[in-house]
Amino acid sequence: MGTNLSVPNPLGFLPDHQLDPAFGANSTNPDWDFNPIKDHWPAANQVGVGAFGPGLTPPHGGILGWSPQAQGILTTVSTIPPPASTNRQSGRQPTPISPPLRDSHPQAMQWNSTALHQALQDPRVRGLYLPAGGSSSGTVNPAPNIASHISSISARTGDPVTIMENITSGFLGPLLVLQAGFFLLTRILTIPQSLDSWWTSLNFLGGSPVCLGQNSQSPTSNHSPTSCPPICPGYRWMCLRRFIIFLFILLLCLIFLLVLLDYQGMLPVCPLIPGSTTTSTGPCKTCTTPAQGNSKFPSCCCTKPTDGNCTCIPIPSSWAFAKYLWEWASVRFSWLSLLVPFVQWFVGLSPTVWLSAIWMMWYWGPSLYSIVSPFIPLLPIFFCLWVYI
């Protein structure tokens, strides 16, 4: 090294050995051969004191550079005080706190002129904003408000954080209702299939139900008549049976709803009897006075008018509603009147009726649950309607 120009250092692996102009060799920062502060190569045999101890750092700078600290020499540097322009006790004072133009944290304190003035009265705040020996009046005059009037208004950019409990309860209720409704729907949809199976089983007493359309012109594989494919001739009969079953279910629901409305007193209990005459008090349609005491719901039915007034007898509203339906149907279907003697005769045979009912319960008992079980999901719906309507 030394003055030997043949020793290359193209990438500057040795500190400050700048032989390549690309590493800053110029008139103010010459290369190694023209560096006035370089150590000559014969001095490299001497033991130097560097940052890593004796003999570990060459005397011509070492890997840490040319600074005294790199050579192991520690010097104390005096602290220079900051200029007056940056001193807190003199020069320009910082601008007092101003209300934010947009309040993106509504849960924080809302700033206004009164709250700002009270905050500036705090001695800790005054010590930061007033110079030494400042005003002795004890008040702080904030910077004049040159902003628009909108800056004094707290403009919220978002609503306060909603409590997670309210969010959970708000979503949990509809989800539970949706789940219960879906469960009831799936159970209700099994009612037509169960009734269809019972209906078709009446045609195959003592044997397994088999679709009769499989031996026709469009043969299909053996299947139940309750699950006919569309190509089976029995598919149309299956759809017809299920349509009748759906109408039957809707009729039951309608009857239950009308009975419920009648029980709540929302329907006239005493219908217009066919053939009744109009009296001075008008047609006998409603019961003016309950039969027994002041009942909340009407529980009587009008018979023939006596002396211009309705004579009420204590009959349950459900029986009154059944009588109303029978009278309504008798007016529109005259042939139903032919069934009255038969019904009266059948009711008169009460022991026979009870024996027949007992025999049917004993005969149909084992399969009665399978017939009634599909209607069980309807019970909660009927109960809710009964309670809340």
From Swiss-Prot:
Residue stretches in coiled coil: none
Sequence segments annotated as region (Pre-S1): 2-108
Residues with glycosylation annotation: N309
Biological-process GO terms, alphabetical: caveolin-mediated endocytosis of virus by host cell; fusion of virus membrane with host endosome membrane; virion attachment to host cell
Region annotated Disordered, chain positions: 77-103
Subcellular location field: Virion membrane
Intravirion side: 2-242, 192-242, 359-364
Upper taxonomic lineage: Viruses, Riboviria, Pararnavirae, Artverviricota, Revtraviricetes
Uses, biotech or industry: Systematic vaccination of individuals at risk of exposure to the virus has been the main method of controlling the morbidity and mortality associated with hepatitis B. The first hepatitis B vaccine was manufactured by the purification and inactivation of HBsAg obtained from the plasma of chronic hepatitis B virus carriers. The vaccine is now produced by recombinant DNA techniques and expression of the S isoform in yeast cells. The pre-S region do not seem to induce strong enough antigenic response.
Annotated lipid attachment (N-myristoyl glycine): G2
Virion surface side: 2-170, 264-337, 388-389
HAMAP family for the chain: HBV_HBSAG (MF_04075)
Homology family: Belongs to the orthohepadnavirus major surface antigen family.
Domain remark in the UniProt entry: The large envelope protein is synthesized with the pre-S region at the cytosolic side of the endoplasmic reticulum and, hence will be within the virion after budding. Therefore the pre-S region is not N-glycosylated. Later a post-translational translocation of N-terminal pre-S and TM1 domains occur in about 50% of proteins at the virion surface. These molecules change their topology by an unknown mechanism, resulting in exposure of pre-S region at virion surface.
Compositional bias annotation for Polar residues: 77-95
Keywords assigned: Acetylation, Caveolin-mediated endocytosis of virus by host, Fusion of virus membrane with host endosomal membrane, Fusion of virus membrane with host membrane, Glycoprotein, Host-virus interaction, Lipoprotein, Membrane, Myristate, Transmembrane, Transmembrane helix, Viral attachment to host cell, Viral envelope protein, Viral penetration into host cytoplasm, Virion, Virus endocytosis by host, Virus entry into host cell
Post-translational modification: Isoform M is N-terminally acetylated by host at a ratio of 90%, and N-glycosylated by host at the pre-S2 region.
Function according to Swiss-Prot or TrEMBL: The large envelope protein exists in two topological conformations, one which is termed 'external' or Le-HBsAg and the other 'internal' or Li-HBsAg. In its external conformation the protein attaches the virus to cell receptors and thereby initiating infection. This interaction determines the species specificity and liver tropism. This attachment induces virion internalization predominantly through caveolin-mediated endocytosis. The large envelope protein also assures fusion between virion membrane and endosomal membrane.
UniProt GO cellular component terms: membrane; viral envelope; virion membrane
Pre-S: region residues: 2-163
Pre-S2: annotated span: 109-163
Transmembrane regions: 171-191, 243-263, 338-358, 365-387
The protein's name in its UniProt record: Large envelope protein
Keyword Transmembrane annotated: yes
Pfam families membership: vMSA
